[in-house]
Amino acid sequence: MTIISDVYAREVLDSRGNPTVEVEVHLESGVMGRALVPSGASTGEYEAVELRDGGDRYMGKGVQKAVDNVNEKIAPELIGENALDQIGIDRLMIELDGTENKGNFGANAILGVSMAVAHAAANALDIPLYVYLGGFNAKQLPVPMMNIINGGEHADNNVDIQEFMVMPVGAESFKEALRMGAEIFHNLKSVLKAKGYNTAVGDEGGFAPNLSSNEEALATIIEAIEKAGYKPGEQVKLAMDVASSELYSKEDGKYHLAGEGKVLSSEEMVSFYEELVSKYPIISIEDGLDENDWEGHKLLTERLGDKVQLVGDDLFVTNTKKLAEGIEKGIGNSILIKVNQIGTLTETFDAIEMAKRAGYTAVISHRSGETEDATIADIAVATNAGQIKTGAPSRTDRVAKYNQLLRIEDELADLAQYNGLKSFYNLSK
């Protein structure tokens, strides 16, 4: 029933028109599982390797090498294996690759297979993916972290901070949270139009206006929240992904906020955040400092770690070794989980488990280059992570995840939980 009969990969396109890997895993029973792999714009230097072809084809971004690795190297080894043995299959692929960073086959090749195997197994058992991955205890719907103003690497504007997000913590259900986010998003469009700003959207569906400062982005979102009829700080909190590694200069060891014409030291960046947190209801800051600025992260954690979720993305890259080091040094209090940063479902789940045991939160995340694949929605519920970051309620590649969560909430019915503010269980103030 669940024995793998074929594994097949093909090159498809992501939401930015760049190639990515799609994998199908076929079982002897005739059941098939399919998965598509995402891709990031701002990437941590310690991420698993995303294999690209180089050359002229697709301007060097082709993934035919990764596709060939699946079809010619991975597939022959997996045929005859049991799709229910997720851990065994993931470990086998890691062993076959033989590198620390999956640079031989490519994390995009390995991840595509890993996710497709899980889909095939769930389909064979005729149960939802979140139930297959999480068991009977998978019932918590995540608070959405909705990116509604884009800057940095995700937009062509003069806003330095990469993402400004809203989190509807005061909702009673995921369905209500999504509605609140969508209403705020549409009101933000009206507010921006009234101010004469562009309402074109960036990679993740949020608006990308040429605002005069990062603080203006926060003030404009507050205006939109109020215009939508909600109370900032009570029903809706703010979150930011600074993606500071993109602002950091190795030459002078400073952070260059070009949009504001400022050059700041690590300590000045921490003070900058303290000022913003004192003025606005910010509950989460991601990658507030460069991925190698551990002293700066330590200072940020000491100053704000009891009242703000400090998320490590480039800092931890969904890697248990990096996370363990951060936990030991008391750096951050949360990890961003991106399946393609590490390259298998098994390692992804290991990172989530390690974070939770240490009292860190885990935020399940998309990438800026996405597809219609909604696997991360199921992962969020399977792990009871409590938070998901998957863009604005705009663009099908983002909305696909939200719609899947609506379906899951419907399926769970009375068992569904939406914890809102309680999802930030490690904040004391």
Curated annotation (Swiss-Prot):
GO terms under cellular component: cell surface; extracellular region; phosphopyruvate hydratase complex
Which CDD domains does the entry link to?
A: enolase
The entry marks the following residues as binding (2R)-2-phosphoglycerate, namely 162, 338, 367-368, 389
Q: Which major enzyme category is it?
A: lyase
Q: What cofactor is needed?
A: Mg(2+)
Alphabetically sorted, this entry's keywords are: Cytoplasm, Glycolysis, Lyase, Magnesium, Metal-binding, Secreted
Could you tell me which pathway this protein works in? Carbohydrate degradation; glycolysis; pyruvate from D-glyceraldehyde 3-phosphate: step 4/5
Record-level Gene Ontology MF annotations: magnesium ion binding; phosphopyruvate hydratase activity
Has UniProt tagged this entry with the keyword Transmembrane helix?
no
Pfam families the UniProt entry points to: Enolase_C, Enolase_N
Classify the source by domain of life. Answer: Bacteria
Q: Active site located where?
A: 204, 338
Database matches in SMART domains: Enolase_C (SM01192), Enolase_N (SM01193)
Task: Tell me yes or no: is Secreted among this UniProt entry's keywords.
Answer: yes
Provide the leader sequence positions.
none
Q: Which GO terms describe its biological process?
A: glycolytic process
* Catalytic activity, as annotated: (2R)-2-phosphoglycerate = phosphoenolpyruvate + H2O
Q: Per the UniProt record, which EC number(s) apply here? A: 4.2.1.11
Which InterPro entries does the record cross-reference, listed alphabetically? Enolase, Enolase-like_C_sf, Enolase-like_N, Enolase_C, Enolase_CS, Enolase_N
Q: What is its main location?
A: cytoplasm
Q: How is the cofactor bound?
A: Binds a second Mg(2+) ion via substrate during catalysis.
The entry assigns this protein to a family as follows: Belongs to the enolase family.
* Protein name as annotated: Enolase
Q: Which organism is it from?
A: Shouchella clausii (strain KSM-K16)
